[in-house]
Amino acid sequence: MNETPETALRRALAMIEPASVRASARIDGGYVELMGDAKAPNPTMASRAMNNRGVAAIYENIWRPFGVSMMGIGGLPMSAERAKAVADLRLRGPQRVLDVACGPGNFTRFLSEQLTEDGIAVGFDISEAMIARAVRDNRGPRAAYVRGDAAELPYADATFDAVCCYAALYLVPHPLQVVDELIRVLRPGGRIAIMTSCQLGLAPLRTVVGLGSAAVGVRMFPKGQFTEMFAAAGMTDIEQDIRGLAQFVSATKN
């Protein structure tokens, strides 16, 4: 098959379920639009930033590296994060990969480049600004983008071989529901990987950091939040790597 960005987009559309949702979707600006004219919610300072075209333009080279540096000693540069994602997801061959809250596609395109044959990486985000930037900067023959609500993923159970969400769960309104959805659409034997915030330190420090984060709309998750959630879901090979105020957690679905 001669893979192009256009064929990847058509394949991304064909994966959407149920059929009624797929029928109501439209191709708009180089991505699959599932939200119609609905705008992304902007209840906090952080969410407003993620829906801003100016932030989308500088996200990969300025905004995100700055955010990583603010997470403290041990934060990984973008290149190392991408390499870790590939290792944690165990990417190889013609896999289907879902990158939720993909932003401007800075991970989606890289993940897609690790795939072969009819493999595809689907970047999924609710922000029009981020999706538009992803199409502009990070389209590819195995990378396609969808705008929709990650709390209700439009895919059948066990659709994907690997699913991930990097640097976003602390911003979304219903993060645990998003993780439940990621687990649902992952096939048995597939890998899930997330990177998010981690609440560490003595109680007074946790309180100060928590209040400061909440003021701008960023959640701080307890250290055991996702390892315990994955274990409760019957997942295995659970791994956690804590770096400063960030945690990387991955697991295999049984």
What are these model-predicted stretches?
Residues 176-188:
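A short glycine-rich, Lys/Arg-flanked "PGG" loop and its adjoining helix->strand segment in the class I
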Residues 151-162:
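A short acidic, Gly/Pro-enriched loop at the edge of an enzyme's catalytic core
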Residues 218-233:
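Short alpha-helix
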Residues 162-174:
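A short SAM/SAH-binding and catalytic strip from SAM-dependent methyltransferases
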Residues 72-93, 110:
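Conserved alpha-helix/loop element of class I SAM-dependent methyltransferases that forms part
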Residues 191-215:
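Conserved class I S-adenosyl-L-methionine
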Residues 2-50:
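N-terminal auxiliary segments of SAM/dcSAM-dependent transferases
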Residues 96-152:
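Class I SAM-dependent methyltransferase SAM/SAH-binding core
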